[in-house]
């Protein structure tokens, strides 16, 4: 009996520690957002002396927003940069979009590369290789096709690239779009995702997504260049790790990496979350324990039980109050990341928040059930440590 009592006391202590850690993450993310995001960065060097940047743009297929998203990169207010458009397939309709923009902006240093170069299983790396090999500037900016920028985005990122910084990344967010699926995405990327993303980076953990990353090319080359990361599906994590292992720091842009895909749905969002969870479990096995207990509903039950065990508080009352506080703080976080008025109502937020939180266990269990992922045009079986093998149809 004494052993059981000791175990229960230990579980209660764990519940209170979980409470402190999760709410510390809430406060860190909100404070950082208020102090850093959506602020104009201080110019650290004269405009004319800003270093050259090679932009690598991987393209696959066309959606309704592609041409508008791409055009924002041709309209950057930056003294010296090149745009390297990379398309894998010769019959990809994205080629026509690229040619249209190349004709419209003849004064922009831009080139189109078709065909890619097979160097590993990662299709994004294979697509980018021809552009990477001819990149002429010391800074490489890898930016996904669905990202939209404003004229001073690149200037902001380069200003963060100080002497000891080797990688500058943007916090992923989502542009205002129509429909509930867009609201669901915006709620996720404005609440749960930045809470973990920001708190991890603030506390020294290297958490980077490859949607918009500015890196020193010489540091990447020291690590073996892009080809060294072609064996991984989550190439962004391993590129960031290689840069950190060489003693370089990371910095976050004051502007978000604004996703503006024209193709979106609830099922696409769910599939994307499952894929990301599979990758995290594969790279960081501790995710199996940490991820479920850090979500609102599960965490509230654990902490509620601890409060009941120690203070005899009603579990369900505590659960409801804790979820309500989480819900309110998430809304504060979302407004901070948005940097302005939201395009949906508080009722839409409440519904999207509840559905997103309710999906978490299903997403996690689905990721555990099947270790294979589908990405772009291929299917891959994940291996322990982050590598993968392509599943070929016989």
Curated annotation (Swiss-Prot):
Name of the protein in question: Ceramide glucosyltransferase
Q: In which tissues is it expressed?
A: Found in all tissues examined.
Gene Ontology biological process terms in this record = cell differentiation; cornified envelope assembly; epidermis development; establishment of skin barrier; glucosylceramide biosynthetic process; glycosphingolipid biosynthetic process; intestinal lipid absorption; keratinocyte differentiation
EC number(s) on record?
2.4.1.80
The record's Pfam families line, in alphabetical order, gives: Glyco_transf_21
Where on this chain is (Q/R)XXRW (motif)?
Answer: 272-276
The gene it comes from is UGCG
Function comment? Participates in the initial step of the glucosylceramide-based glycosphingolipid/GSL synthetic pathway at the cytosolic surface of the Golgi. Catalyzes the transfer of glucose from UDP-glucose to ceramide to produce glucosylceramide/GlcCer (such as beta-D-glucosyl-(1<->1')-N-acylsphing-4-enine). GlcCer is the core component of glycosphingolipids/GSLs, amphipathic molecules consisting of a ceramide lipid moiety embedded in the outer leaflet of the membrane, linked to one of hundreds of different externally oriented oligosaccharide structures.
Alphabetized UniProt keyword annotations:
Acetylation, Glycosyltransferase, Golgi apparatus, Lipid biosynthesis, Lipid metabolism, Membrane, Sphingolipid metabolism, Transferase, Transmembrane, Transmembrane helix
């Amino acid at each position: 009996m004494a052993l059981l009592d000791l175990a229960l006391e230990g579980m209660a202590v764990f519940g209170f520690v979980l409470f402190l850690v999760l709410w510390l993450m809430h406060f860190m993310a909100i404070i950082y957002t208020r102090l850093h995001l959506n602020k104009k960065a201080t110019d650290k060097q004269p405009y004319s002396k800003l270093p050259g940047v090679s932009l690598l743009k991987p393209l696959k297929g066309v959606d309704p927003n592609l041409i508008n998203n791409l055009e924002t990169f041709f309209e950057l207010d930056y003294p010296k940069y090149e745009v390297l458009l990379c398309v894998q397939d010769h019959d990809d309709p994205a080629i026509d979009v690229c040619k249209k923009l190349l004709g419209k902006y003849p004064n922009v240093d831009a080139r189109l590369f078709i065909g890619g170069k097979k160097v590993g299983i990662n299709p994004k790396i294979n697509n980018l290789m021809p552009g990477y090999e001819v990149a002429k500037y010391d800074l490489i900016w890898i930016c996904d096709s669905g990202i939209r920028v404003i004229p001073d985005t690149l200037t902001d990122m380069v200003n963060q690239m100080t002497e000891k910084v080797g990688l500058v990344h943007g916090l992923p967010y989502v542009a205002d779009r129509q429909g509930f699926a867009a609201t669901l995405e915006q709620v996720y990327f404005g609440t749960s995702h930045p809470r973990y993303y920001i708190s991890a980076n603030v506390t020294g953990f290297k958490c980077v997504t490859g949607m918009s990353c500015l890196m020193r090319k010489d540091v990447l080359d020291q690590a073996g260049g892009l080809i060294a990361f072609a064996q991984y599906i989550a190439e962004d994590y391993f590129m960031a790790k290689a840069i950190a292992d060489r003693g370089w720091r990371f910095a976050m842009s004051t502007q978000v990496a604004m996703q503006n895909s024209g193709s979106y749905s609830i099922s696409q969002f769910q599939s994307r979350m499952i894929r990301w969870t599979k990758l995290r479990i594969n790279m960081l096995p501790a995710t199996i324990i940490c991820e479920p207990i850090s979500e609102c509903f599960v965490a509230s039950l654990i902490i509620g039980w601890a409060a009941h065990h120690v203070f005899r508080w009603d579990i369900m009352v505590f659960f409801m109050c804790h979820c309500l506080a989480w819900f309110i703080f998430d809304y504060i976080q979302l407004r901070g990341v948005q940097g302005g008025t939201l395009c949906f109502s508080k009722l839409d937020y409440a519904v999207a928040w509840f559905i997103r939180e309710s999906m978490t266990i299903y997403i996690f269990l689905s990721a555990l059930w099947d270790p294979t992922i589908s990405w772009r045009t291929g299917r891959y079986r994940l291996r322990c440590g982050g590598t993968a093998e392509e599943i070929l149809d016989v």
